[in-house]
Amino acid sequence: MNSCLNELQAMQLRRLLETGLPLAARPYQRLAEQIGSVEEHVLQQIQRWQEEGLFRRVGLVLKHRALGFRANAMLVMDIPDAQVDEIGRRLGQAAGVNLCYQRPRRLPQWPYNLFCMVHGREREQVCQLIERLLADNGLSEVPHQLLFSTRAFKQCGGRFAPPLREVVNG
Protein backbone atom coordinates (compact mmCIF):
# COMPACT_ATOMS: atom_id res chain seq x y z
CA MET A 1 0.00 0.00 0.00
CA ASN A 2 1.51 3.32 -1.06
CA SER A 3 1.18 6.29 1.21
CA CYS A 4 -0.81 9.25 0.02
CA LEU A 5 0.97 11.44 2.57
CA ASN A 6 4.28 13.11 1.82
CA GLU A 7 7.21 12.58 4.18
CA LEU A 8 6.55 15.75 6.16
CA GLN A 9 2.84 14.98 6.57
CA ALA A 10 3.67 11.43 7.68
CA MET A 11 6.10 12.72 10.30
CA GLN A 12 3.58 15.33 11.48
CA LEU A 13 0.97 12.60 11.80
CA ARG A 14 3.34 10.44 13.86
CA ARG A 15 3.97 13.37 16.18
CA LEU A 16 0.25 14.09 16.54
CA LEU A 17 -0.49 10.43 17.28
CA GLU A 18 2.07 10.54 20.10
CA THR A 19 0.03 13.22 21.84
CA GLY A 20 -3.17 11.20 21.54
CA LEU A 21 -6.26 11.25 19.39
CA PRO A 22 -8.37 14.39 19.44
CA LEU A 23 -11.62 14.10 21.36
CA ALA A 24 -13.85 14.50 18.35
CA ALA A 25 -16.54 12.55 16.53
CA ARG A 26 -14.04 12.02 13.66
CA PRO A 27 -10.57 12.14 15.22
CA TYR A 28 -8.78 10.96 12.08
CA GLN A 29 -10.46 13.67 10.04
CA ARG A 30 -9.29 16.23 12.60
CA LEU A 31 -5.73 14.89 12.34
CA ALA A 32 -5.93 15.07 8.55
CA GLU A 33 -7.00 18.71 8.72
CA GLN A 34 -4.04 19.49 10.97
CA ILE A 35 -1.53 18.12 8.44
CA GLY A 36 -3.25 19.36 5.29
CA SER A 37 -4.63 16.03 4.12
CA VAL A 38 -7.84 14.01 4.15
CA GLU A 39 -9.14 11.38 6.56
CA GLU A 40 -8.81 8.52 4.06
CA HIS A 41 -5.09 9.21 3.59
CA VAL A 42 -4.50 9.35 7.34
CA LEU A 43 -6.24 6.01 7.82
CA GLN A 44 -4.25 4.47 4.96
CA GLN A 45 -0.99 5.68 6.50
CA ILE A 46 -1.91 4.30 9.94
CA GLN A 47 -2.82 0.94 8.38
CA ARG A 48 0.52 0.89 6.54
CA TRP A 49 2.44 1.59 9.75
CA GLN A 50 0.52 -1.16 11.48
CA GLU A 51 1.34 -3.61 8.67
CA GLU A 52 5.02 -2.58 8.89
CA GLY A 53 5.02 -3.24 12.63
CA LEU A 54 5.57 0.35 13.75
CA PHE A 55 2.83 -0.26 16.28
CA ARG A 56 0.44 -3.09 17.04
CA ARG A 57 -2.63 -1.16 18.07
CA VAL A 58 -4.06 2.22 18.88
CA GLY A 59 -5.22 2.36 22.47
CA LEU A 60 -6.28 4.66 25.23
CA VAL A 61 -4.06 6.10 27.96
CA LEU A 62 -6.46 6.80 30.79
CA LYS A 63 -5.38 9.39 33.34
CA HIS A 64 -7.20 7.52 36.08
CA ARG A 65 -6.00 9.69 39.00
CA ALA A 66 -7.52 12.78 37.40
CA LEU A 67 -10.84 10.91 37.31
CA GLY A 68 -10.70 10.14 41.04
CA PHE A 69 -9.29 6.62 40.85
CA ARG A 70 -6.58 6.88 43.48
CA ALA A 71 -6.42 3.27 44.72
CA ASN A 72 -4.39 1.63 41.99
CA ALA A 73 -2.95 -1.83 42.39
CA MET A 74 -1.09 -4.45 40.45
CA LEU A 75 -2.07 -8.03 41.19
CA VAL A 76 0.95 -10.24 40.56
CA MET A 77 0.51 -14.01 40.37
CA ASP A 78 2.56 -17.14 39.86
CA ILE A 79 0.46 -19.05 37.35
CA PRO A 80 1.57 -22.45 35.99
CA ASP A 81 3.04 -21.94 32.52
CA ALA A 82 0.58 -24.35 30.92
CA GLN A 83 -2.35 -22.25 32.18
CA VAL A 84 -1.05 -18.70 31.91
CA ASP A 85 -2.46 -17.93 28.43
CA GLU A 86 -5.96 -19.13 29.22
CA ILE A 87 -6.07 -17.52 32.68
CA GLY A 88 -4.59 -14.32 31.31
CA ARG A 89 -7.33 -14.12 28.66
CA ARG A 90 -10.04 -14.65 31.26
CA LEU A 91 -8.65 -12.10 33.69
CA GLY A 92 -8.01 -9.59 30.92
CA GLN A 93 -11.72 -9.63 30.09
CA ALA A 94 -12.90 -9.43 33.70
CA ALA A 95 -14.76 -6.36 34.92
CA GLY A 96 -12.41 -4.03 36.76
CA VAL A 97 -9.20 -5.29 35.17
CA ASN A 98 -7.68 -2.54 33.04
CA LEU A 99 -4.62 -4.41 31.87
CA CYS A 100 -3.42 -8.02 32.07
CA TYR A 101 -0.12 -9.27 30.72
CA GLN A 102 2.50 -11.97 31.10
CA ARG A 103 6.17 -11.36 31.89
CA PRO A 104 9.01 -13.78 32.59
CA ARG A 105 9.69 -14.75 36.18
CA ARG A 106 12.98 -13.52 37.68
CA LEU A 107 13.77 -16.38 40.02
CA PRO A 108 14.47 -16.64 42.85
CA GLN A 109 13.59 -13.03 43.75
CA TRP A 110 10.46 -12.62 41.64
CA PRO A 111 8.30 -15.72 41.06
CA TYR A 112 5.40 -13.91 39.37
CA ASN A 113 4.52 -14.21 35.70
CA LEU A 114 1.01 -12.72 35.33
CA PHE A 115 0.14 -9.10 36.10
CA CYS A 116 -3.29 -7.43 36.34
CA MET A 117 -3.79 -3.70 36.86
CA VAL A 118 -6.88 -2.60 38.76
CA HIS A 119 -7.99 0.97 39.51
CA GLY A 120 -10.49 1.99 42.15
CA ARG A 121 -11.60 5.05 44.04
CA GLU A 122 -10.83 3.45 47.40
CA ARG A 123 -8.35 0.80 48.55
CA GLU A 124 -11.06 -1.41 50.08
CA GLN A 125 -12.96 -1.42 46.78
CA VAL A 126 -9.85 -2.71 44.98
CA CYS A 127 -9.21 -5.39 47.64
CA GLN A 128 -12.79 -6.65 47.34
CA LEU A 129 -12.57 -6.73 43.56
CA ILE A 130 -9.33 -8.72 43.70
CA GLU A 131 -10.74 -11.20 46.24
CA ARG A 132 -13.78 -11.76 44.01
CA LEU A 133 -11.62 -12.03 40.88
CA LEU A 134 -9.39 -14.66 42.48
CA ALA A 135 -12.33 -16.62 43.91
CA ASP A 136 -14.38 -16.53 40.69
CA ASN A 137 -11.43 -17.88 38.72
CA GLY A 138 -10.30 -20.52 41.21
CA LEU A 139 -7.08 -18.66 41.94
CA SER A 140 -7.38 -17.92 45.67
CA GLU A 141 -4.65 -20.46 46.50
CA VAL A 142 -2.27 -19.34 43.74
CA PRO A 143 0.80 -17.48 45.07
CA HIS A 144 0.09 -13.77 44.58
CA GLN A 145 0.62 -10.28 45.95
CA LEU A 146 -1.38 -7.09 45.64
CA LEU A 147 0.90 -4.10 45.16
CA PHE A 148 -0.65 -0.66 45.56
CA SER A 149 0.85 2.36 43.82
CA THR A 150 2.49 4.86 46.12
CA ARG A 151 3.06 7.55 43.50
CA ALA A 152 2.18 8.31 39.91
CA PHE A 153 4.63 8.50 37.06
CA LYS A 154 4.12 10.27 33.77
CA GLN A 155 1.71 8.40 31.52
CA CYS A 156 2.04 8.77 27.80
CA GLY A 157 1.55 6.88 24.61
CA GLY A 158 4.25 5.46 22.39
CA ARG A 159 6.99 7.52 20.81
CA PHE A 160 7.49 6.82 17.12
CA ALA A 161 8.98 9.85 15.42
CA PRO A 162 12.34 11.61 15.48
CA PRO A 163 12.24 15.35 16.18
CA LEU A 164 10.41 17.12 13.36
CA ARG A 165 13.40 19.35 12.54
CA GLU A 166 15.36 16.24 11.42
CA VAL A 167 12.78 15.65 8.69
CA VAL A 168 12.44 19.30 7.71
CA ASN A 169 16.20 19.93 7.62
CA GLY A 170 16.84 16.52 6.06
Curated annotation (Swiss-Prot):
MF terms in GO: lyase activity
Keywords: Lyase
Pathway(s) of this molecule: Porphyrin-containing compound metabolism
Enzyme class per UniProt: lyase
Phenotype of gene-disrupted mutants: Insertional mutagenesis results in the loss of respiratory nitrite reductase activity in vivo and in vitro. Mutant strains synthesize a periplasmic cytochrome cd1 that lacks heme d1.
Pfam families the UniProt entry points to: AsnC_trans_reg2 (PF17805), NirdL-like_HTH (PF22451)
Catalytic activity: siroheme + 2 H(+) = 12,18-didecarboxysiroheme + 2 CO2
Top-level division of the source organism's lineage: Bacteria
Family label: Belongs to the Ahb/Nir family.
Function: Involved in heme d1 biosynthesis. Catalyzes the decarboxylation of siroheme into didecarboxysiroheme.
Subunit structure: Probably forms a complex composed of NirD, NirL, NirG and NirH. All proteins are required for the total conversion of siroheme to didecarboxysiroheme.
Protein name, per record: Siroheme decarboxylase NirL subunit
Protein's organism: Stutzerimonas stutzeri
